[in-house]
């Protein structure tokens, strides 16, 4: 599809580009502007709008399209409003201008992760409302802050609040990842983020000496053990074509800290690791493994967790799950190929699943390179619009799932 001039641009694309220009970029997102944007959109669409301040300055905006049968549980469409930082010098276009090139690619931070999805939800609801539809189940759209830094001042708090329980969510959709092939990836579980800092203490002294028991030597041993484990998991993934990235445990060494001068042996050094633990791992045994690598390195080597998710959940992807049945039926009817996978990263879906709500991670972008968090993050307007079509089919099906035992 070739690009149209601005006067011919699809209004859904225009709204998408407007949202992309709001600078909700970490570490200082302009959440006020995002909330105002959704309030205004709610007004235009005739949707209920509720603001829940889960922490000072951290507002969850809830837009609601009531269903015809209030006894049924609702459909929750979640998206986060924050985006990750940019390295502006590596971008072909200003990442907050939402520039559209002559082919129709829209360049912006958040184009894939996940401002596209927020607008696709809204535009699908708009279309269905304009066509005069009503569905039995209520549809709530939640726009949440803070996901990109862990969701601790966003969804993690929101799911504990009475306002969340009052939504009576029976099923949720949240973000997925683009797929470069013709297929669409859908995520039914997630790896658990474990952020681990290993601190090593040892003998300080003059750096000209062969000092024994130094912090660096012991830290080196732990780093070796963990990177050997990384290599093992990588080989396991490489050698088995049936395994996807989310099915093995990954780890990266992301920070090294310590030292004051070239010629002073420091008494303390630390290494930080980002583990993503596969859902089928025995968590207790895995933690013991980490502890034993530290112990094997010598005295004075300890670890602490900056993040340690312990509640991985799996949403069934067979017809025993009526939500999956409805979701996959629509995709089949639309001739979309689905690739069910475990999310390699972490999303707010982990909090939603942990309070007992089945959830899928889905960002309808096929034939699209995976550019989330990358330079030149972009999405073709035709792929974006196709996503609106997909939600326009998914929402009626999900919001019409007949009464379930869990609804009463
Ligand atoms: C682990 S906190 C979540 C932040 C981000 N979504 C990630 O997966 O890294
Ligand atoms: Zn995201
Ligand atoms: Zn992200």
UniProtKB/Swiss-Prot annotation:
Homodimer. Interacts with SPHK1. It is found in: Cytoplasm. Expression is highest in kidney, strong in brain and weaker in placenta and spleen. It is an enzyme of class 3 (hydrolase). GO terms for molecular function: aminoacylase activity; identical protein binding; metal ion binding. Belongs to the peptidase M20A family. It catalyses: an N-acyl-L-amino acid + H2O = an L-alpha-amino acid + a carboxylate; N-acetyl-L-methionine + H2O = L-methionine + acetate; N-acetyl-L-glutamine + H2O = L-glutamine + acetate. The lineage of its organism: Eukaryota, Metazoa, Chordata, Craniata, Vertebrata. It is linked to Aminoacylase-1 deficiency: An enzymatic deficiency resulting in encephalopathy, unspecific psychomotor delay, psychomotor delay with atrophy of the vermis and syringomyelia, marked muscular hypotonia or normal clinical features. Epileptic seizures are a frequent feature. All affected individuals exhibit markedly increased urinary excretion of several N-acetylated amino acids. Its cofactor is Zn(2+). Changing residue 147 to D: Decreased protein stability. Loss of enzyme activity. Catalyzes the hydrolysis of N-acetylated amino acids to acetate and free amino acids. Zn(2+) 1 binds at residues 80, 113, 175. This is Aminoacylase-1. GO terms for biological process: amino acid metabolic process. Changing residue 381 to D: In a breast cancer sample; somatic mutation. Its EC number is 3.5.1.14. Binds 2 Zn(2+) ions per subunit. Its main location: cytoplasm. Zn(2+) 2 binds at residues 113, 148, 373. Pfam families: M20_dimer (PF07687), Peptidase_M20 (PF01546). It comes from Homo sapiens (Human). The keyword Ribonucleoprotein does not apply. The gene is ACY1.
């Amino acid at each position: 599809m070739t690009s149209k001039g601005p006067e011919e641009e699809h209004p859904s694309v225009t709204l998408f580009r407007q949202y992309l220009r709001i600078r909700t970029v970490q570490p200082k997102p302009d959440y006020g502007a995002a909330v105002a944007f959704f309030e205004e959109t709610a007004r235009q669409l005739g949707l209920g709008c509720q603001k829940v301040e889960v922490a000072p300055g951290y507002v969850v905006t809830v837009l609601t399209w009531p269903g015809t049968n209030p006894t049924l549980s609702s459909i929750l469409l979640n998206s986060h409003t924050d985006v990750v930082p940019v390295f502006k010098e590596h971008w072909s276009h200003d990442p907050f201008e939402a520039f559209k090139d002559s082919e129709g690619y829209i360049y912006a931070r958040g184009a894939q992760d996940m401002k596209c999805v927020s607008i696709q939800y809204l535009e699908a609801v708009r279309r269905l409302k304009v066509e005069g539809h009503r569905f039995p189940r209520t549809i709530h759209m939640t726009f949440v802050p803070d996901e990109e830094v862990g969701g601790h001042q966003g969804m993690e708090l929101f799911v504990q609040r009475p306002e969340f329980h009052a939504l009576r969510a029976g099923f949720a959709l949240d973000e997925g990842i683009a797929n470069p092939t013709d297929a669409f990836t859908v995520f039914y579980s997630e790896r658990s983020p474990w952020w681990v800092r290993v601190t090593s203490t040892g003998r300080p002294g003059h750096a000209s000496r062969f000092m024994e028991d130094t912090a660096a030597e012991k830290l080196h041993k732990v780093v070796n053990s963990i990177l050997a484990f990384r290599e093992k998991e990588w080989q396991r993934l490489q050698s088995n074509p049936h395994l996807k990235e989310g099915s093995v445990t990954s780890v990266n060494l992301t920070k090294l800290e310590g030292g004051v001068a070239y010629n002073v042996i420091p008494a303390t050094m630390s290494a930080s690791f980002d583990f993503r633990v596969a859902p089928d791992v025995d968590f207790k045994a895995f933690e013991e493994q980490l502890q034993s690598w530290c112990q094997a390195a010598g005295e004075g080597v300890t670890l602490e967790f900056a993040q340690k998710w312990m509640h991985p959940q799996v949403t069934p992807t067979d017809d025993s799950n009526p939500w999956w049945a409805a979701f996959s039926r629509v995709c089949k009817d639309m001739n979309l190929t689905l690739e069910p996978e475990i999310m390699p990263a972490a999303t707010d879906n982990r909090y939603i699943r942990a309070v007992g709500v089945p959830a899928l991670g889905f960002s309808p972008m096929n034939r699209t390179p995976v550019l989330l968090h990358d330079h030149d993050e972009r999405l073709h307007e035709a792929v974006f619009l196709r996503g609106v079509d997909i939600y326009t089919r998914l929402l009626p099906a999900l919001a019409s799932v007949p009464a379930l035992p869990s609804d009463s």
